Amino acid sequence: MCIRDRYRVSALQTARLLADRALSGVSRGHLRLAPTWTPEEASVVIQIRLPRILSAALIGAALSAAGASYQAMFRNPMVSPDLLGASTGACFGAALAILLGASYAVITAGSFLFGLAAVGLTYLVGRLSRMRSNLAMVLAGVMVGSLFSAGTSFIKLVADTNEQLPAITYWLMGSFTSASYQKILIGLSLIHI
């Protein structure tokens, strides 16, 4: 028996576990809810908590798929988007857009484009090295990631401390507070592509 087969979990089992954890978590937290909900409590659960839970699950699945595709593409189980500079490139792009006073759509696009640029730069540096191996690609990713991380730190240093710096920090930390069913559908369509 292969070790891989021992830990195989079906999508149905995963969905069942996620639903169980999500529903059991409804009554936990700062505000405990009774098994029967008032209309206000039902609204909080359905309109606020459920979109956040679904968003977290969707983003977790997307990050997992991104990591698995990176590992397959580079044939290296240690490779991940953050190791190849994609994460720090995306952070730099978002921070730069916030510093320039861009809209939410431009911030998102800048983050995406700089993430792609970081991976492209990592690939270019890795291919130009004498080693031409996966190790060279990983080392190039660490180098590019450090470069973009330093750039993000510089942007945070020169940003306005009253508005821009908190916005940059909040963006880099991430949040599910603005989750909605419409955004989940948009995210599903983008991940499907």
State the predicted function of each range.
Residues 4-191:
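Alpha-helical transmembrane segments in inner-membrane proteins
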